[in-house]
């Protein structure tokens, strides 16, 4: 039903990366653990840290920086590899998992779950609120992305549960929407998690289902 997918681009791991992967192996090794990596990267260290893991290789250029990674996570070929599962849990190596509640989250029927981007209280101060209204007007006028759309939305892709078929089908059905993001200049509002959290339901006649931001805090926090 679900696999844990760990994207990696190097085996020069920090101490925190190693702690993260050891914890993953300790708590979650009864699930399939799949490392997504460049073709040229040796699997040896990852196999040592997570002995039951398997590997999916992609061309090296798909890991050549943040932009390339974002494009990989919006690509048909990525989700196609995991169509044998209903869900994948993306687990980047800066995550730390406290306990296993994965199956209970899979059973809730959401299409995407990640740590919510909580709106900070400072944005409700009168001066800041006025500034944000002007900013929103200008972004709409010039058809630019608006960071205010992220407030209390779900959420961060670093630890995220994704319905594989829903993601795969959207990419196939709306290639021009995907292309607008993949061809945009590197900017955080064009990141893949913004795409899956916000952009898809601007176009999708069959909307993605997300938890509200309070519920999502029980899944993960950033």
Residue ranges and their predicted role:
Residues 1, 123-149:
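Membrane-proximal basic amphipathic "stem/tether" segments
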Residues 1-22:
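N-proximal low-complexity "stem/linker" segments adjacent to membrane-targeting elements
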Residues 12-16, 39-46, 102:
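Short, charged/polar "capping" segments at the starts of alpha-helices
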Residues 20-31:
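Short, acidic, metal-binding catalytic loop of nucleotide-sugar glycosyltransferases
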Residues 36-86:
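Active-site-proximal specificity loops/subdomain of glycosyltransferases
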Residues 85-97:
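Short beta-strand-to-loop acidic/aromatic patch adjacent to the donor-nucleotide binding site
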Residues 96-134:
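Conserved donor-nucleotide/metal-binding helix-loop-beta segment in metal-dependent transferases, i.e.
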Residues 141-222:
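Catalytic core and acceptor-binding pocket of nucleotide-sugar-dependent glycosyltransferases
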């Amino acid at each position: 039903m679900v696999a844990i997918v760990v994207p990696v681009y190097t085996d020069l791991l920090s101490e925190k990366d190693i702690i993260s992967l050891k914890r993953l192996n300790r708590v979650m090794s009864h699930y399939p653990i799949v490392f997504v990596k460049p073709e040229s990267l040796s699997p040896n260290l990852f196999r040592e840290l997570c002995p039951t893991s398997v590997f999916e290789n992609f061309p090296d250029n798909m890991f050549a920086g943040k932009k390339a990674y974002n494009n990989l996570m919006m690509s048909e070929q990525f989700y196609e590899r995991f169509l044998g599962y209903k869900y994948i849990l993306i687990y980047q190596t800066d995550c730390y998992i406290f306990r296993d509640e994965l199956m209970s989250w899979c059973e809730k029927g959401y299409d995407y779950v990640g740590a919510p981007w909580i709106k900070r209280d400072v944005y409700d101060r009168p001066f800041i609120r006025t500034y944000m209204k002007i900013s929103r007007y200008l972004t709409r006028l010039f058809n630019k992305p608006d960071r205010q759309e992220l407030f209390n939305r779900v959420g961060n892709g670093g630890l995220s549960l994704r319905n594989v078929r829903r993601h795969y089908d959207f990419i196939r059905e709306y290639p021009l929407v995907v292309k607008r993001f993949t061809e945009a200049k590197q900017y955080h509002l064009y990141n893949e998690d913004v795409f899956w959290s916000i952009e898809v339901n601007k176009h999708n006649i069959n909307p993605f289902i997300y938890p509200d931001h309070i519920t999502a805090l029980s899944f993960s926090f950033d």
